[in-house]
C-alpha cells in the first residue's frame, strides 16, 4: 500500500529517505511509532469495510432461512430463483451452499450465464413468432434431426390416374379383308348350299372369287358361329312364347279346373240366372278340360 504510506507521511512531515531507514526527521523519536500505528489502523479499517459482511440469515440453507420459509409462503422460491431483472442487470446467481465472495472478488461483477433453450428465462426471451404457430402458408423450418432421412417422413406420392388398359393386338396381324358386294353374295349363296367345304371345293371357290383359301376358310368359320347364335336366340323366343299364362282368379285354388266343382258352379250359375224375376246374364264359364293340371303345380314351376 505505497500510496497510503505517502499520503500519511506528507502531513506528518516525514521524508521518504528517513522513513526508509527508520530515522525520524526533525519531529522526535516519539512521532514515528504513532504515525505507523495510525496508518495500520486506517488500512485495517479499509479492508474490513471492503469485505462484505455475510449474515447467517442470508444463506439459503441456514436455519433462519428454512424457518422463514415456513412462516412466509413464497420465500423459498424468491431465495432459490433470482429474479429476471437481477440477471439482466449483470448479477450472477451464486451456487447453493457457497457464500458470496468466495468464488472471486466481490467488486467485479461476474458475467451472466447463457440461458438454455428450455429454461424459464430462455422461453421468456424467445420471440413471439417462435412460441406461436405460424399461420403463413410457407413451410416451417425443420430442426436438424428432422431433416435427416431417418426421421423425416417419406414424401407423399402423387396418385396418378390408372392407365386405361387397351386391347393389345399382334404386331404381325394382317389387316381386315374388305370383301366386295359380289364376293359377299357369292359366299352367302355357297354357305346356304353347304356350310362345310372340302379342301378341293374351297380351293376352287376361292380361285373363282380371287381370294385365298385362308380368307374363305375364316369367313365360313365366322358365318357358322353367327348362324349358331341366331339359332339359339330363336329357340329362346320359342320357349318364352310356349309358357302358359294363368288366369288371375285361379291363384290359391288346388282343385283341377273343369272337374265336378266347375260343373256344379256352372249349374248354380244357370239356376241363379233363371230363378229371379229379372233375368241376369250368366257368367262365362271356362271350357271343361282346358286346365287339367293343379294350379299349385303350375305356380311351383313358375317360381
From Swiss-Prot:
PTM entry text: Sumoylated by PIAS1, desumoylated by SENP1. Sumoylation of Lys-15 and Lys-133 not required for interaction with H1-5, transcriptional repression, inhibition of myoblast differentiation, or binding to gene promoters.
Record key words, sorted: Developmental protein, Disease variant, DNA-binding, Ectodermal dysplasia, Homeobox, Isopeptide bond, Nucleus, Repressor, Transcription, Transcription regulation, Ubl conjugation
Superkingdom of origin: Eukaryota
Biased composition, Low complexity: where in the chain?
31-44
User: Where is the Glycyl lysine isopeptide (Lys-Gly) (interchain with G-Cter in SUMO) crosslink found in the sequence?
Assistant: 15, 133
Which GO MF terms are attached to this record? cis-regulatory region sequence-specific DNA binding; DNA-binding transcription activator activity, RNA polymerase II-specific; DNA-binding transcription factor activity, RNA polymerase II-specific; DNA-binding transcription repressor activity, RNA polymerase II-specific; p53 binding; RNA polymerase II transcription regulatory region sequence-specific DNA binding; sequence-specific double-stranded DNA binding; transcription cis-regulatory region binding
Question: What would changing residue 84 to V do, according to UniProt?
Answer: In OFC5; cleft palate only
State the DNA-binding region(s).
Answer: 172-231
Q: Does the keyword Calcium apply?
A: no
* GO BP field: activation of meiosis; anterior/posterior pattern specification; BMP signaling pathway; bone morphogenesis; cardiac conduction system development; cartilage morphogenesis; cell morphogenesis; cell surface receptor signaling pathway involved in heart development
Region (Disordered): which ranges?
18-55, 69-117, 133-174
For bias type Basic and acidic residues, the affected ranges are 133-142
What SUPFAM superfamilies does the record tag this protein with? Homeodomain-like
Q: Where in the cell is it found?
A: Nucleus
A Pfam match is Homeodomain
Function summary: Acts as a transcriptional repressor. Capable of transcription autoinactivation. Binds to the consensus sequence 5'-C/GTAAT-3' in downstream activin regulatory elements (DARE) in the gene promoter, thereby repressing the transcription of CGA/alpha-GSU and GNRHR. Represses transcription of myoblast differentiation factors. Binds to core enhancer regions in target gene promoters of myoblast differentiation factors with binding specificity facilitated by interaction with PIAS1.
Please give the family membership noted in the entry. Belongs to the Msh homeobox family.
Query: Which medical condition is this protein associated with?
Result: Tooth agenesis, selective, 1: A form of selective tooth agenesis, a common anomaly characterized by the congenital absence of one or more teeth. Selective tooth agenesis without associated systemic disorders has sometimes been divided into 2 types: oligodontia, defined as agenesis of 6 or more permanent teeth, and hypodontia, defined as agenesis of less than 6 teeth. The number in both cases does not include absence of third molars (wisdom teeth). STHAG1 can be associated with orofacial cleft in some patients.
Its name, as the record gives it, is Homeobox protein MSX-1
The organism of origin for this protein: Homo sapiens (Human)
